[in-house]
């Protein structure tokens, strides 16, 4: 008999359808700098870029997919005859307790997720923050609590925030939000334009400028203080990072003006401004309102000297290059990956300006991202380098390089970088360059301000935003990969503000088969964490967390991947102590070896799988498939290569480069009388192999999906002959071929994606109560099929418009766990009581 969970779905969806060595702590990828970040970018890129049609409009496809989903939901709502439905409930992390900072052993701090921008309205005492894909949140109690404001908007990727007021009426601030994250990581989603609120974020209109900004990131946005109907914005590459799409078809990047309060936007086409430069940052001159400054990048244009600092003296109409022309600013010889600008009025008729660049170090002239800062004390007429700040963004200028000049105090300037160099694991002295620095003498010297012993906290790595509270001297707020912090004394002490801010970017998660509401998940730059019924998730292990698994028989056995890199680190973290352990064992590919080839091709987040039949057998994927038997019970677990060392991700022509495994699934053998397991593997270049002899040999079984990334493989728990694949890609096809199905144990495959929009499908899960019902987590939300993949319908009540990266059945019980990339985790549970009293 159907439970209430299934009956409600049937009512709503059926109607709609008719319409190595063990170490104490693994290396932090933030300390590996650009090399490791580029691997994370490549991992994300492979799941979203059409490998055959590089001009395909991937971010435009995302917006189209979201609109298709919303149209289907409108039909669904109109068709419903009952008002009740199961609703996805947020379950955190809010926050992650004991989270990782550069000195986590001494100062474990609550963390939330990547905060890209911050803006403050002093009239309402309101702080607004924008998440990487978490949308806009507001706090009116100085960060004690947070409320999401934009969950239903077309993009939750935030690139810029601007607040405008014509008076001090409470609740009447005008807020502009530029969508599309501008931090130039491949998981920086593109946006859809500019949204506007005239009631301090209670309601929104837009998106405006969709034709100009769709698929881009609005990296800088400012309201003219002399004319609030005039706005200036700069747009960047947007979808999926700095160089993740070759020559995409998208609107031109550049500098834009609006003269009607943000409703329409016009690209600046002055001959002095080269076409299609990417904008990085924008400010109105602190002293002269008709002067504007914009930092620009060439990125994929191959014309490095054209990027840099541009100035307008006619209120944004025309712009001139300052690099190489203004005294003290060097001519560029390499393409800059990012540039930052900020400034303040010195009170004597001049603007004090600071420009941070991703220039190379002097001993590595061909490599960018070293970091230099130039200062002008005469409104940009002349400049001088601040040599004390050399290397301030620590090799990651493309990702984190903020500078903030304290308003009305030309002597105080703050800088942000990647990580806390020079801090020993247990309270060693701080040295510069550092994650966060302050100068009290205009940049002659800098001091590091990362630790806060008196408040028992420390800053997280990767700084993205630094702002002052208007009118409050020395009060600053910062946003980084771990969330939000506040200081009221210029960074000497810090107050952690990651309370109810649910913006965690999950990569993978799992559920406990024996205990309800016990989950485990890996996150971007915030480690691997656990859930045991409270929205505050305890932090369990460090680094970047990827695949995360709970032993379904012995639930204290936990295993997960960190980041992986060929010839650097390949391995797993694990514990047999459950959530009580705060430090995992780290098993690498080096002496004493774990059996995995150190030079293997491997994804940044390598796939893991615990055997369905033999719970202590762990599978690990590179281009080869490895298995470790008795993994948790062995004193020194090691992996052995399966399939006689067969490459299970060989190159797909016309490419000559092989891929890496991305998905693993096992099931009791489908061959009658055979005790051997059936094993499936999928790769990032679309290869699918099967073994029916427990891994002795493999045969390729699906060659019809055009090389698209295999994100998940699911064997139907009610019929092992039925197998599904999730393909993570924008395919440009209708139907999109992002779900494939086999009814003969994986021997042959057919498309099963009718009704899905053209968008990456990241995860699949069976319905916990009804055979033949399958759920799919995508980049634009959740979809469900009640006919074994025949047709699909959106099901998103309570879910923000965010990408779902993993999806698991919660056992025991009848719940589904959805782990998102930017809004934390959500649970769809049959324990919810509806207004009409519907129950099991």
What is each PLM-predicted segment?
Residues 19-23:
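Boundary at the C-terminal end of the N-terminal hydrophobic targeting segment
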Residues 8-16:
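Bacterial N-terminal signal peptides
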Residues 1-8:
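Bacterial N-terminal signal peptides that target proteins for export
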Residues 829-840:
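Low-complexity, Pro/Thr/Ser/Gly/Ala-rich linker/spacer regions in secreted
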Residues 24-830:
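Beta-propeller blade termini and top-face loops
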């Amino acid at each position: 008999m159907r439970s209430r969970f299934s009956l409600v779905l049937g009512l709503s969806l059926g109607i709609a359808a008719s319409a190595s060595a063990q170490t104490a702590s693994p290396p932090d990828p933030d300390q590996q700098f650009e090399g490791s970040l580029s691997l994370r970018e490549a991992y994300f890129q492979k799941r979203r870029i059409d490998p055959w049609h590089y001009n395909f409009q991937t971010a435009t496809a995302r917006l189209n997919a979201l609109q298709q989903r919303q149209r289907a939901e409108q039909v669904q709502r109109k068709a419903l005859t009952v008002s009740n439905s199961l609703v996805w409930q947020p379950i955190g992390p809010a926050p992650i307790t004991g989270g990782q900072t550069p000195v986590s052993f001494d100062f474990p701090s609550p963390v939330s997720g990547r905060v890209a921008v911050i803006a403050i309205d002093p009239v309402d005492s309101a702080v607004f923050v924008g998440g990487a894909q978490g949308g806009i949140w507001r706090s009116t109690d100085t960060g004690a609590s947070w409320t999401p404001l934009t969950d239903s908007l077309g993009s939750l990727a935030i690139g810029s925030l601007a607040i405008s007021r014509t008076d001090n009426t409470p609740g009447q601030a005008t807020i502009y939000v530029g969508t599309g994250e501008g931090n130039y990581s491949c998981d920086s989603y593109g946006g859809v334009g500019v949204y506007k609120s005239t009631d301090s974020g209670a309601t929104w209109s837009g998106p405006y400028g969709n034709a100009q900004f769709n698929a881009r990131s609005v990296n800088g946005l400012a309201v003219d203080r002399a004319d609030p109907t005039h706005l200036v914005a700069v747009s960047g590459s947007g979808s999926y990072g700095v160089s993740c799409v070759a020559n995409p078809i998208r609107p031109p990047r550049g500098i834009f003006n609006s003269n009607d309060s943000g409703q329409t936007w016009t690209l600046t086409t002055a001959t002095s401004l080269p076409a299609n430069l990417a904008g990085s940052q924008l400010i109105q001159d602190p002293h002269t309102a008709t002067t504007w400054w914009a930092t620009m990048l060439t990125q994929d244009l191959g014309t490095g000297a054209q990027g840099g600092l541009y100035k307008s003296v006619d209120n944004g109409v025309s712009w001139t290059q300052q690099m190489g022309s203004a005294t003290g600013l060097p001519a560029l010889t390499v393409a800059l990956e990012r540039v930052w600008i900020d400034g303040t009025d010195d009170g004597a008729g001049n603007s004090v300006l600071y420009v941070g660049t991703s220039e190379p170090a002097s001993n590595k002239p061909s490599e960018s991202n070293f970091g230099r800062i130039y200062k002008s004390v005469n409104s940009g007429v002349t400049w001088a380098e601040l040599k004390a700040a050399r290397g301030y963004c620590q090799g990651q200028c493309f990702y984190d390089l903020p500078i903030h000049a304290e308003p009305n105090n030309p002597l105080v300037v703050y800088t942000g970088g990647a990580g806390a160099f020079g801090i020993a694991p247990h309270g060693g002295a701080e040295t510069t360059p550092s994650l966060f620095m302050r100068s009290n003498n205009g940049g002659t010297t800098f001091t590091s301000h990362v630790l806060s012993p008196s408040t028992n906290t420390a800053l997280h790595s990767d700084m993205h935003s630094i702002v002052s509270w208007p009118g409050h001297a020395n009060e600053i707020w910062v946003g980084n990969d771990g969330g939000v912090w506040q200081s009221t004394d210029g960074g000497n002490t810090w107050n952690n503000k990651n309370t109810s801010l649910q913006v965690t970017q999950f990569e993978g998660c799992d559920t406990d088969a024996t205990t309800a509401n016990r989950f485990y998940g890996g996150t971007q730059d915030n480690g691997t964490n656990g859930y045991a019924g409270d929205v505050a998730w305890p932090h369990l292990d460090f680094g970047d967390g990827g695949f995360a698994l709970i032993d379904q028989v012995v639930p204290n056995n936990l295993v997960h991947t960190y980041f992986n890199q060929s010839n650097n680190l390949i391995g797993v973290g694990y514990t047999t102590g459950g959530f009580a352990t705060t430090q995992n064992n780290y098993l690498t590919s080096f002496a004493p070896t774990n059996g995995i080839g150190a030079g293997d091709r491997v994804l940044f987040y390598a796939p893991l799988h615990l055997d369905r039949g033999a719970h202590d057998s762990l599978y690990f994927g590179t281009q080869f498939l490895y298995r470790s038997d008795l993994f948790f019970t062995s004193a020194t677990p090691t992996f052995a290569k399966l399939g006689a060392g067969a490459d299970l991700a060989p190159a797909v022509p016309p490419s000559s480069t092989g891929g890496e495994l991305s998905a693993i699934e096992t099931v009791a053998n489908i061959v009658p009388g055979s005790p051997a397991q059936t094993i499936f593997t999928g790769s990032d270049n679309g290869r699918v192999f099967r073994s029916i002899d427990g891994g002795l040999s493999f045969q390729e079984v699906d060659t019809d999906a055009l090389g698209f990334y295999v994100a998940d493989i699911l064997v139907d728990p009610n019929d092992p002959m039925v197998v599904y694949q999730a393909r993570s890609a924008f395919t440009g096809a209708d139907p999109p071929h992002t779900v494939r199905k086999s009814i003969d144990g994986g021997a042959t495959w057919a498309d099963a994606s009718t009704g899905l929009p053209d968008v990456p499908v990241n995860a699949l899960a069976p319905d916990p109560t009804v055979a033949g019902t399958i759920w799919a987590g995508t980049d634009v939300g959740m979809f469900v099929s009640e006919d074994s993949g025949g047709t699909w319908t959106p099901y998103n009540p309570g879910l923000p418009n965010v990408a779902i990266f993993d999806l698991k059945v919660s056992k025991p019980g009848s719940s589904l766990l959805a782990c998102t990339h930017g809004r934390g985790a959500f649970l769809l549970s049959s324990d919810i009581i509806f207004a009409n009293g519907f129950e099991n």
